[in-house]
Amino acid sequence: AVLNYGFNELQLSLITANCYPHNKRSQQVLKRNGFIYEGTLHQAELTYNGNIYDHECYYIPNIARPTEQDYDELIRLWEKSVRSTHHFLTEESIQFYKPLIRNHYLPAVALFIIRNSHGKIAAFMGLSDELIEMLFVHPDEQGKGYGKRLIEYAIRQKQIDKVDVNEDNDQALRFYQHLGFEIIGRDETDSMGKPYPILHLQLTDDKK
């Protein structure tokens, strides 16, 4: 309820929380609610009895809907992410897909974004009725939990448990398998008939 009030009523882009390193219960509660560990503030608090404590810092970013005015930023993020992770794509393929993503794929899905503390889009996800159609994270923002937060939102809030992944995108495949997805099928080509095999994944029952 507190998170919903902060994000929905106050329109906060980020909610932070601190706890002591020895307070394992608080850490578990924060992680269970989607908070991401950011780092430790050393000697952050001087108590009344003279003890000095560290603080572990956590944050949870808001998930918002972009507008059409955000599409140019989204396509720039898409290209940076693809060049960082889709090494199997040729330059010709990237230039082929770029206008399709901008003009056809983005308007065709329900888009969700996460902005960083500077207001820039750090990651975005596109959903259809039954499938996670796309997930892209800016290379500078990878490893911060943005992708995981978006996927957990798709699973818990939208009840979507399927995703397609390029077979040659090992990083994405490992990411989804770590979250509990398993391979249930394979196509030799992508949706445009290009020679990039696609793996069909679904969340295992014990992870739903």
Predicted segments with their positions:
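Conserved catalytic-core motifs of GNAT/GCN5-like acyltransferases
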Residues: T16-N18, I36-N51, D164-N166, E182-L199
